[in-house]
A protein has these predicted regions:
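Conserved ATP-binding/catalytic core of the eukaryotic-like protein kinase fold
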Residues: 1-154
């Protein structure tokens, strides 16, 4: 069920929807403690109702939160508000690689640059024991600073 604008999840106030997929809905939200905008991913209820999936989610969230890399979206927080479980992540502005590819192929120089950035990010994650479970163009955000990996399948 979509969250209404103004809904509070702990210190995070929902501002607008950003997207939805099989693993939940993502919203732009305001961190009222730190005064910054963040992305909040609300997880489906069936995920949190299953104890094994909930434990896996919490393990993976802990592992992902340890990743510090310029080309990996930072996980800031996890929380529960009533029966709603959520992740709080860095808000990454830009367009996904999937969106960009609808306008045609990338120049070879961009393919090399973004490919190297994604490979470096994946190497860092793998060295930390974290596997990206949903690597696809829709989970690569292109920003002014380069490529950022999103959504490690949490």
């Amino acid at each position: 069920m979509p969250l209404a604008v103004g809904t509070r999840l702990g210190p995070y106030e929902i501002l607008s929807p950003l997207g939805a997929g099989g693993m939940g809905e993502v919203y732009r939200a305001r961190d009222t403690r730190l005064g910054r905008d963040v992305a909040v991913k609300v997880l489906p209820g069936h995920l949190m109702a299953n104890a094994e999936l909930r434990a896996r989610f919490e393990r993976e969230a802990r592992a992902a939160s340890s990743l510090n890399h310029p080309h990996i979206c930072t996980l800031h927080d996890v929380g529960h508000e009533g029966d709603i479980a959520y992740l709080v992540m860095e808000l990454v502005e830009g367009e996904t690689l999937a969106e960009r590819l609808t306008r045609g192929p990338l120049p070879a120089s961009d393919v090399v640059k973004f490919g190297a950035q994604i490979a470096d990010a994946l190497d860092r994650a793998h060295r930390a024991g974290v596997i990206h479970r949903d690597l696809k163009p829709g989970n690569v955000m292109l920003t002014k600073a380069g490529a950022k990996l999103l959504d490690f399948g949490l």
